[in-house]
């Protein structure tokens, strides 16, 4: 199949060059949940419904268990470990879906249904921190369209190298989070150090020729 041929080509280029640069649209479909109407929500109880304003925070709206079960089975829904992306407001914020019952606002919160034999979700999360896309400016709210995400190019090394990079960045991440009670200057210095190594690890040397079309 075309997908199998694509995976084989990617792995060949990774073997030859160490990594391959490909657009996010080539590693999986960009997905979103089915639209939830305001009339389907309440502010008291049920399955948490996250809107762009509560993404990564506490939900202030809920949907019924029945609606959740129906929509999860009939329409797009993230898998545990998928990296959700904010497509409006503060562009590019990420939340790793933990598998707990929750529903997410359509179009404003999206994810890539990627093949983890090519790129790990944990690696993707760090790539998203670099914000490889270009947000469209229009109206009062900056908007990240599916096309912006699909055309964004990232460097993907072998799975083994992805795991190594993730392990290093996870350790830096933990150190930075453990410093929340430290001196502001120390916290800032650690954060800059983390960003420096993250950028170095995720920015591979470019080749003159295109590695992937």
What kind of feature is each model-predicted range?
Residues 19-24, 47, 78, 82-84, ...:
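Short, structured motif recognition centered on aromatic/hydrophobic residues
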